């Protein structure tokens, strides 16, 4: 439904590239199959991926790349209209229908990153966390970060916990979030 598509766009569009050297990455890859809908965005530094089951698929599996600018409009339309979203693929264009509203955009052509090979298949680190709790913890740590004082949030994943911290000229912040599993000391910085 529209709320699902809207959140999929929101959660992947931040990684859409603005670099015109690779125009195909200035959009998001949509893969439709019996398994559901997968939306992928990449910008050379980040990869954002979201999967959801689909209510109904007509025809076989297909994929396309939609421009990021068009997806921003689709997201806005989904916010205003509470209807089912229909996606129709043409040879060079994509039609998004939300209620009485239609948006037609051109497909981006080119070879999109093979994201399935970019993500390691086997990973010795396996953790489970509550995303709501993690986001709340992240918000608490981010209070010392501003547009002027950009600094990464460092996350250290250990046995049953992740420690998040940020340091800027205006102060330091630290918070601990409970997880299931052992992060084996994995440290990640998020901008």
Give residue ranges: language-model regions.
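DNA polymerase processivity clamps
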Residues: 1-51, 55-108, 123-191
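Glycine-rich, pocket-lining loop/helix-strand segments that form or immediately flank
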Residues: 111
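Bateman (tandem CBS) regulatory domains
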Residues: 118-122
């Amino acid at each position: 439904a529209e709320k699902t598509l809207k959140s999929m766009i929101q959660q992947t569009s931040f990684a859409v590239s603005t670099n015109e050297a690779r125009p195909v990455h200035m959009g998001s890859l949509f893969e439709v199959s019996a398994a559901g809908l997968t939306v992928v965005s990449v910008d050379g530094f980040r990869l954002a991926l979201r999967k959801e089951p689909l209510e109904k698929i007509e025809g076989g599996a297909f994929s396309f790349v939609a421009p990021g600018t068009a997806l921003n409009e689709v997201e806005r339309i989904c916010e205003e209209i509470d209807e089912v979203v229909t996606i129709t693929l043409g040879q060079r264009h994509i039609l998004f229908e939300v209620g009485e509203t239609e948006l037609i955009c051109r497909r981006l052509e080119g070879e999109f990153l093979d994201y399935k090979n970019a993500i390691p298949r086997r990973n010795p680190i396996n953790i489970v966390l509550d995303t709501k709790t993690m986001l709340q913890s992240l918000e608490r740590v981010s209070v010392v970060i501003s547009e002027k004082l950009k600094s990464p949030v460092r996350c250290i994943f250990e046995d049953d916990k992740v420690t998040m911290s940020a340091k800027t000229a205006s102060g330091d912040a630290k918070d601990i979030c409970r997880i299931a599993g052992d992060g084996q000391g994995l440290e990640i910085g998020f901008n």
